[in-house]
C-alpha cells in the first residue's frame, strides 16, 4: 500500500542556480547534496512537510537527466512513493 509521497525529483540544468531559487520558493534550506556517480547526477534535497524535493543535475551531457532536459526542459522527472511492500505494489500496478 502506498503510504505517502517520499520525494519529488526535479531535473535542473544547474544546482548552483537552482538551489537558491528553490530555497526562496520553498522558504527552506537545502539540507543535503550528494553525487550519485552510478546515475551520473548531482542531487540536492529540501524537506517540505513530511516529504522532500530532490533536484537532479546531470554530470554528463549524455546522461539520463541531460537527455530529459534536452527533450522536455527542466521540470518534474519522477515522483517516489513510500510503500509497505514494493513487489506487491509493482504487481498491483
Label for each model-derived stretch:
Residues 7-9, 45, 78-80:
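Short aromatic/hydrophobic contact patches that present stacked aromatics
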Residues 55-63, 71-73:
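Conserved secondary-structure micro-motifs at functional edges
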Residues 25, 64-68:
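A short, polar/proline- and glycine-enriched secondary-structure boundary/capping micro-motif
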Residues 2, 10-52, 59, 88-91:
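Core segments of cupin and vicinal oxygen chelate
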Residues 5-6, 30, 76-77:
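Short, contiguous strand/loop micro-motifs
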Residues 68-93:
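Mid-chain, well-packed structural core segment of small domains
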Residues 9-10, 66:
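Short, recurring structural edge motifs at helix starts
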